């Protein structure tokens, strides 16, 4: 997508052919900073510290993390360590394990002399596949927005509500939930996005608002608790969110607060769609609430807030009393019954076991 008018990806191979460049998302929206990853441990830190985030991008970064490890040491022990270190960084996003399994399959059975080239080749393929998948999601979701636009008066906007950041910053390019939004905008459809701030990390405020602005998509930043009010007053036409894991039964694990948006959407007859790339499906899990591990993050993410001062300094200040007990769950699960449809690269399907297995039979069969 565009940054200051220049086509940009969220992850790339540096000109030296082996180190990996990423955008440091912790610096956005106030500074555009890139970071070079040169070791397995640097890649793991980037994932763990949310320098990069978003399920597809976590997978892509993990893939290159394996490649960096193999470059230093192509032994079986090095491969196993890379797998274990990266898998432990973020437990909820299934793309992480999917990408690591793909890398192991591509590298493990090769002679050591071939492993370096094979690892970098598969990591690059995973990145290109992500772009193709998300482009497919955009094409699948575009008719939904076109249908909503057809009911509007001339020049009246389709209003989309989204939660967290499922944009190109969460993927290699174009994003998942934003893919149909960007395509609609580029097709000249009047579209406007309500972006939840998404406490406590504020990905909606810091990332979604930034990237929508860079692409010229009209948008309004709202507090997390505003969505239900907007829906009650007919100001939201559709909710489109991303996901970090979808179960075989269609339950959706996404950023904390997504479940509340789905409940509000159901109560107000607003369609609730989930943009789902196929690597995010976990056919090994059926009940999302009972089986998906929910990451619990540091208390300071809730008890403090970071922003830019009037003098231009980036500072973190505490907003809760010292010693306050904090619960910081990173994700929640929206039951399949609340999901209008899953927007996949193979079309819009029901959030059900039959629909998922029908659309992706090879992946469903591999999980048995």
Write out the residue ranges for each language-model feature.
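Long amphipathic alpha-helical segments
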Residues: 2, 9-113
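Short beta-strand segments
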Residues: 23, 61, 65, 97-99, ...
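Short, hydrophobic/aliphatic alpha-helical segments
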Residues: 35-51, 158-162, 312-323
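Generic structural signal for well-ordered, non-membrane alpha-helical segments
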Residues: 36, 40-43, 55, 59, ...
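Conserved phosphate/anionic-ligand binding catalytic regions in large, soluble enzymes, centered on
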Residues: 49-62, 95-96, 160, 165-174, ...
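Ligand-binding beta-strand-loop-alpha-helix segment within the catalytic cores
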Residues: 97-159, 191, 195-239
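Histidine-anchored nucleotide/phosphate-binding helix
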Residues: 175-186, 262
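Conserved phosphate- and dinucleotide-binding cores of soluble alpha/beta proteins
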Residues: 190-191, 198-368
């Amino acid at each position: 997508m565009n940054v200051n008018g220049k086509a940009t990806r969220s992850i790339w191979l540096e000109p030296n052919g082996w180190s990996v460049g990423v955008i440091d998302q912790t610096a956005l929206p106030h500074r555009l900073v890139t970071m070079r990853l040169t070791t397995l441990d640097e890649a793991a830190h980037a994932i763990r510290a949310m320098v990069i985030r978003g399920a597809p991008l976590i997978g892509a970064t993990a893939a290159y993390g394996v490649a960096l490890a193999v470059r230093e040491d192509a032994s079986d022990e090095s491969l196993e360590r890379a797998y274990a270190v990266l898998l432990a960084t973020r437990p909820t996003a299934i793309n992480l394990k999917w990408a690591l399994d793909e890398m192991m399959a591509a590298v493990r059975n090769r002679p050591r002399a071939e492993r370096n080239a094979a690892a970098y080749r598969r990591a690059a393929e995973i990145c290109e596949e992500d772009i193709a998948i998300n482009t497919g999601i955009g094409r699948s979701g575009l008719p939904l927005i076109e249908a909503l636009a057809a009911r509007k008066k001339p020049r009246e906007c389709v209003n989309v509500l989204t939660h967290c950041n499922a944009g190109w910053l969460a993927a290699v390019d174009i994003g998942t939930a934003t893919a149909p939004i960007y395509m609609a905008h580029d097709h000249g459809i009047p579209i406007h996005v309500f972006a939840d701030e998404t406490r406590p990390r504020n990905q909606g405020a810091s990332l979604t608002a930034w990237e929508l602005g860079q692409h010229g998509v009209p948008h309004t930043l709202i507090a997390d608790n505003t969505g239900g009010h907007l829906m009650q007053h007919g100001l939201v036409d559709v909710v489109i969110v991303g996901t970090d894991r979808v179960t075989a039964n269609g339950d959706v694990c996404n950023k904390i607060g997504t479940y509340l948006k789905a409940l509000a959407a159901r109560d107000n007859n607003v369609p609730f769609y989930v943009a789902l790339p196929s690597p995010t499906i976990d056919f090994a899990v059926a009940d999302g609430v009972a089986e998906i591990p929910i990451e619990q993050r540091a208390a300071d993410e809730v008890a403090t807030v970071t922003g830019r001062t009037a003098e231009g300094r980036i500072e973190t200040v505490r907003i809760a009393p010292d010693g306050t007990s904090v619960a910081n769950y990173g994700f929640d699960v929206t039951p399949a019954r609340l999901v209008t449809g899953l927007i996949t690269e193979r079309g819009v399907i029901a959030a059900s076991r039959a629909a998922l297995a029908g659309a992706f039979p090879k992946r469903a069969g591999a999980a048995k």
